[in-house]
Amino acid sequence: MDSGRDSGNDSGSVNMARARVALTEHTRYVHDFPAEGVLFEDLTPVLANAEAFAAVVDAQAEAAEELGAEIIGGLDARGFLLGSAVAYKLGLGVIAIRKKGKLPPPVVTQDYDLEYGSAALELPAEGLDLEGRRVVLIDDVLATGGTLAAARKLIETCGGNVTGYVLAIEVGGLGGRERLGDIPVHVIRDPQ
């Protein structure tokens, strides 16, 4: 446990162990992308391998279930893939938390800063009832935590309650966990 929050590595589950192996064996590393000095961890090979993808989805679904998810929030873009699969496995609905400009109006918008710029997330302002619902946010990577913190604010603005964050991997040294506050963070593979 890290600061009272589950890092994912405390779990002795078979699902978590399989997912860690899958991530270790299939993650591709790209130096100096998207900017000089950044090591990008590309999960494309993990997602493209059926067994590796299933292992990660199973571990994330287990964590989301433990967090009492009533609906899954998948972050643009790889969070859509993982979040949809987790929601399907758990028999839950999924909401796509989109980057700015991808949804028709009216929308609810939340601005935030990245480690290499700024951006915004959006949800539809109509047709989505999150009032009082327990939302677990799912994405591929925890870096600075800016995107996830913005997603939490967006969900809360729409009336939902974020009960946890579930990530495949974490990039160390960027303060991501600290930025997320006291909500549980489940990470399959901690920083390398």
Swiss-Prot record:
Protein name: Adenine phosphoribosyltransferase
GO CC annotations, alphabetized: cytoplasm
Subcellular location: Cytoplasm
HAMAP family reported for this sequence: Aden_phosphoribosyltr
Pathway: Purine metabolism; AMP biosynthesis via salvage pathway; AMP from adenine: step 1/1
Primary role: Catalyzes a salvage reaction resulting in the formation of AMP, that is energically less costly than de novo synthesis.
PANTHER family reported in the protein's UniProt record: ADENINE PHOSPHORIBOSYLTRANSFERASE (PTHR32315:SF3)
Biological processes annotated in GO: adenine salvage; AMP salvage; purine ribonucleoside salvage
Assembly notes: Homodimer.
Known EC number: 2.4.2.7
Pfam families: Pribosyltran
InterPro entries (UniProt xref): Ade_phspho_trans, PRibTrfase_dom, PRTase-like, UPRTase/APRTase
Family: Belongs to the purine/pyrimidine phosphoribosyltransferase family.
Alphabetically ordered keywords of this record: Cytoplasm, Glycosyltransferase, Purine salvage, Transferase
Catalytic reaction equation(s): AMP + diphosphate = 5-phospho-alpha-D-ribose 1-diphosphate + adenine
Keyword Heme annotated: no
GO molecular-function term, one example from the UniProt record: adenine binding
